[in-house]
Amino acid sequence: RPALLNIDTTRMFVDPAFPQCGRLMPELIEALTDITECFRTLDLPIYYSRRDDRRHPVQRGIWNLKLGNTDEFIYSEDPRADEWPEAYAPREGKDVIVFKNKPSCFFETPLESWLRYDRIDTLIVVGVSTSGCIRAGVVDAFSHNFRVIVPEEAVGDRSASAHRANLFDIDMKSGDVEPLADVI
């Protein structure tokens, strides 16, 4: 039983108004919209993950060392930052949202438990960024014995070379990278 796992595709990461946005985003939004519509038509479960609100340095933890003690990259004052574009936004009472503090949406969250309760055995993983949160989530999903499929047009990264290298590694080790048309 498959579920769609949409990782970090809030405006903060897909809207060019935010500095975290990557270059591949117009095509990515179209792919996210298409696969979301497919899952909704088939009445299959959709899970979303996004960052938790990490205003205090203790809550950000080791991010402080990696990114510096600034809010520029991991926090935005703009209230739209944590919203999803309307084209594929979660539906209240229907879709599930998991809040995370680290790259993997499985790390110290109830996601695995929720997926098991929902009898999910396969995850279609979409979102950003391929070299960070996508890869971390895919490896953890694989480690929890979920089959993982990544539609290559439905993931993105700020770095094209990192994107390609991580898709190669995912396909070799922990998931199946497939064309979006084959997944739909």
Where are these regions (language model features)?
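Active-site-adjacent betaalpha module
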Residues: R1-A3, E37-L42, L67-I184
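Active-site acidic carboxylates
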Residues: R1-E92
